[in-house]
């Protein structure tokens, strides 16, 4: 264990099979939290659990779990509360997005699917976890917007993704207002391009990586751990006076 910053806290982290969700689950457990995870891809979740066992980290998981299905979300929340008697931290890291230029985008299979996979999944988890956070006397919700909630993604057909992440940003500010009387804090992290299984293919597109690097003040691509460190702060009591805020973790891209 790296520290006891999250000791005694119960964290529910979605999308632990890869990327940011995996990074947050491992980081939280290393700092003392009990972690319940989930993923729609069972194999990825099992890989994360294997890593956790090697380090003797307290991570369990419910998988496969389709967060666009309200029944699956409720099952996840109930399993977490049954195992740990409550929820202190909710990290909505799982997301799915389809990329297409507007003239080619299908309304049902791409636009609506992306809003379900980036916005609905956050709403459903927050709604189901809400009464349990209230019962604990408050807690921390950590959602993920994006640099593309602020700026266009040049050279990429990211219209639905930008809309979904912009929605997460606005929704989280409203959640912060509604949660404040209950001691519930809600914040967003807006990552730049993070190297994950989902982004590696696009990084191979000729010229794309170079375009991204040209926008960065800090000349390296982000890693899941860069985001997990910020999430650890927001999950901890160190951030007890922080709510309705957005943290840009993007190598300086949106400051240029």
Label for each model-derived stretch:
Residues 31-47:
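Conserved glycine-rich Rossmann-like NAD(P)H-binding loop of the short-chain dehydrogenase/reductase
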Residues 142-167, 172-173, 177-181:
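Catalytic loop of short-chain dehydrogenase/reductase
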Residues 180, 185, 242-244:
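Short, small/polar-rich loop/turn modules that mediate ligand/substrate recognition or access, typified
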């Amino acid at each position: 264990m790296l520290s006891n910053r999250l000791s005694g806290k119960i964290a529910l982290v979605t999308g632990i099979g890869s990327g940011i969700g995996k990074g947050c689950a491992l980081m939280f457990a290393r700092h003392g939290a009990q972690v319940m995870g989930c993923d729609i891809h069972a194999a990825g979740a099992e890989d994360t659990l294997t890593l956790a066992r090697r380090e003797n980290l307290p991570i369990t998981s419910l998988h496969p779990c389709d967060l666009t299905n309200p029944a699956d979300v409720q099952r996840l929340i109930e399993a977490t509360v049954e195992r740990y008697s409550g929820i202190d931290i909710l990290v909505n890291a799982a997301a799915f997005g389809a990329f297409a230029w507007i003239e080619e985008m299908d309304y049902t299979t791409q636009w609506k699917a992306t809003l379900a996979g980036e916005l609905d999944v956050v709403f459903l988890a927050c709604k189901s976890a809400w009464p349990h956070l209230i019962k604990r006397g408050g807690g921390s919700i950590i959602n993920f917007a994006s640099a593309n909630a602020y700026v266009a993604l040049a050279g990429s057909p990211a219209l639905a993704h930008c809309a979904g992440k912009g929605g997460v940003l606005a929704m989280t500010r409203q959640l912060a207002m509604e949660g404040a009387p209950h001691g519930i804090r809600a914040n967003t992290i807006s990552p730049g391009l993070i190297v994950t299984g989902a982004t590696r293919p696009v990084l191979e597109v000729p010229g794309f990586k170079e375009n991204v690097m040209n926008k960065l003040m800090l000349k390296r691509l982000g890693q899941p751990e860069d985001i997990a460190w910020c999430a650890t702060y927001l999950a901890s009591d160190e951030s007890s006076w922080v709510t309705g805020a957005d943290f840009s973790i993007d190598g300086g891209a949106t400051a240029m």
